Amino acid sequence: MVLVHEGDQVATPQSPDTCPVVPGPGSRIAAGLDPEIDLVISGHSHQAYICKIKDPAGQDRYHTQGSSFGRIITQIDFRVDRKTRDVIRSSVSADNHVVTRTITPDPEVEAYVQTWKERVSVVANRPVGNITATIARDPSGAGESPLGNLIADAQLEAAREGGAEIALMNPGGVRADLTYPASGSEGDGVVTYGEAFTVQPFNNLVQVVTLTGEQLRRLLEQQWTESYTRVLQPSASLTYTADLTKPIGSRVSDIKINGIPVTDTQRIRVAANNFLIGGGDGFTVFTEGTELWSGPLDIDAFVAYLSAHSPVDPPATDRITFIR
């Protein structure tokens, strides 16, 4: 069996045991894997589904996902041939169960969790910086968010050693707001390590690759597809115009770095997390990049920026000019 961090979207919410998916990268991976694989457990898209997909040999195999944040538990049962030690494909069954939280907590598990909460709190409650107001992850009408822009600025600063000129952050990787009201006893406007980690919890590396101006334009065009829109959060050094009245693939113009127009042949050092550099969220142009440089973890870059620039104001969301 294969566990893969990629999945599909659900067209309309239905029972978690059904398969109302819009075929996407998860289905394509599940359909293309070796016929010897009997089960594909997917993730990433935070959906609930139990599907059967034909493998390359034309045989059905399960392709499942159990939503996110512990809301669904996928129960998978199968038998193994004792002689061959192979999974009997016809015996595989899968069911998604909604977590209702109606069961009595196990005292031993609760005690174990509490022990680690107390140990982690020493690190989590450590102040790392200050903010002047809540810095939100929700995008503005231009598709930018103050927090997304802040993270891009932090990653650009952390990647200067790798020659970075601009940075781009995927909006899905911004997991929570930085709130001005205190979450504990730290005081209003104080950012703790735990709060910063909640914003950036993936431990991705900040990396840099070289793209041409033409490749950067194609990368930015990948923000819009027939299925979805994902606006990359730009560092302050990058500005451009996006004309939404034009066809998909022809919307981006007037790209500038530090106010200077970008040419197609120009070589640009672009910073992003390793998820994006690997082509994640459909930004495949990143994989054309050369001269890879790897730097710090994204959380370390974020914490360092907050510490160095406190108190931090919410960045303006004026780096992309939209025409509608």
Language model features by range: what are they?
Residues 1-2, 40, 44, 78, ...:
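Divalent metal-coordination and catalytic microenvironments
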Residues 11, 48-50, 176:
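Conserved protein kinase catalytic core
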Residues 18, 105, 120, 140, ...:
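Generic alpha-helical structural element
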